[in-house]
Swiss-Prot record:
Tissue expression per record: Highly expressed in embryos and at lower levels in roots, leaves, flowers and anthers.
Protein name: Inositol-tetrakisphosphate 1-kinase 4
Quaternary organization: Monomer.
Cofactor note: Binds 2 magnesium ions per subunit.
Induction / repression: By drought stress.
Stored PANTHER family: INOSITOL-TETRAKISPHOSPHATE 1-KINASE, INOSITOL-TETRAKISPHOSPHATE 1-KINASE 4
Gene source species: Oryza sativa subsp. japonica (Rice)
Region Disordered, residue ranges: 225-248
GO biological processes: inositol trisphosphate metabolic process
Pfam families associated with the record: Ins134_P3_kin, Ins134_P3_kin_N
Binding positions for Mg(2+) 2 per the UniProt entry: 289, 291
GO molecular function terms noted in the UniProt entry: ATP binding; inositol-1,3,4-trisphosphate 5-kinase activity; inositol-1,3,4-trisphosphate 6-kinase activity; inositol-3,4,5,6-tetrakisphosphate 1-kinase activity; magnesium ion binding
Record: residues binding 1D-myo-inositol 1,3,4-trisphosphate: 65, 157, 190, 291
All residue ranges annotated as the ATP-grasp domain in the record: 107-318
Amino acid sequence: MAPELSSPSSSPRYTVGYALLPEKVSSVVRPSLVALAADRGVRLVAVDVSRPLAEQGPFDLLVHKMYDRGWRAQLEELAARHPGVTVVVDSPGAIDRLLDRATMLDVVSGLRTPVSVPPQVVVSDAAADADELLARAALRFPLIAKPLAVDGSAESHDMRLVYRRDGVLPLLRAPLVLQEFVNHGGVLFKVYVVGDRATCVRRSSLPDVPARRLLDLDAEPSVPFANISNQPLPPPDDDGGAADDDTPAAGFVDEVARGLRRGLGLHLFNFDMIRERSEEHGDRYFIIDINYFPGYAKMPGYEAALTDFFLEMLRGTRPVPEQLGPGSGLDMEARKLEPGLGIGLRELESGRAQA
């Protein structure tokens, strides 16, 4: 759909479709976002997932977070039936990497910034020997046990904190990841990425585990934990709290976010980062999770950030990353696209076709 030539006060010039699960809609597409987007010439339209995608729209831009294989087939049909019409963000092939905790954090090793991933091992065999696995990976307790698949279900967020070996054995019934738990002062830094913008929010996290807890044989060997990182912490200088330098420097956060964005080939995601402070090693940062298309309503000022991003994508003013992320899912269309601009279902002007 070509943009209409109209003033900002007239009807929207662009149509952005969104295909999200119901629970995701409520955490992203709020009235405040709809109003701001409309005021700036963008109309947000929900995709009816019960109807063929190719029969809807047309859309200038399509954002999505759907998990079933049928959705990818619908994107391919949309490209075939309406070539050169819609830009899709982000590409299914790039998103796939974040739906498997075995590959989710691989990108971190390629970053140029001093950040890493806690040691972890993938358990794919229910008959695996716990001692052998732990020894081979050189893991130390406590551990976090995470389901291998990330599919939006409640089960994919069912995690446990494991204090000793006999807490591991009951968990080996399903594919999972065992990751070392790093004491981090009960503070998690959740970084929201929208295009080239990164916003860091301090949130509560699991408290540190004292050494004596690992030796307490009368205590439970493992315990489930809910996702308690959704509550923002007070500013670091409130009520005698942490020092002013508690939150990572903005330049550091931006550099990490930029590296992840280029390595993943994604525009919309967040990542969880923690910091270990010790006299032996000083400050060490770890990335423990990356999530595609998070609940942006928890990000301060998300309405303006998303609206700006939509317009940049639609107007072709997005900065060009160094490389396209792994696998577009629609390879023949992705070749028409500037690196990092999603799936190229829209033909780009020849002047913008080169990176």
